[in-house]
Amino acid sequence: TSLCAERQKYIVQNLETALYLTVNNPSGYADVTLXAFDFGXNQLFXLIP
């Protein structure tokens, strides 16, 4: 369970980073955000037994 929690925390931090970059670098927001969400989704699927 702790491993899952760590992964989920990492996903949240990754998405927060993407949001920060989106706000501070609007011209490149699409690629950064999509990559972050793709990474997050892959991590979430890894949590499914």
From Swiss-Prot:
Protein origin, superkingdom: Eukaryota
UniProt keyword annotation of Isomerase present: no
GO molecular function ontology, one term from the record: carbohydrate binding
Keywords linked to the UniProt accession: Lectin
Tissue specificity: Stored in spherulous cells in the sponge tissue.
Its biological purpose: Possesses D-galactose binding specificity.
Quaternary state and interactors: Homodimer.
Protein's name in the database: Lectin-2
Annotated source species: Axinella polypoides
Taxonomic lineage of the native organism: Eukaryota, Metazoa, Porifera, Demospongiae, Heteroscleromorpha
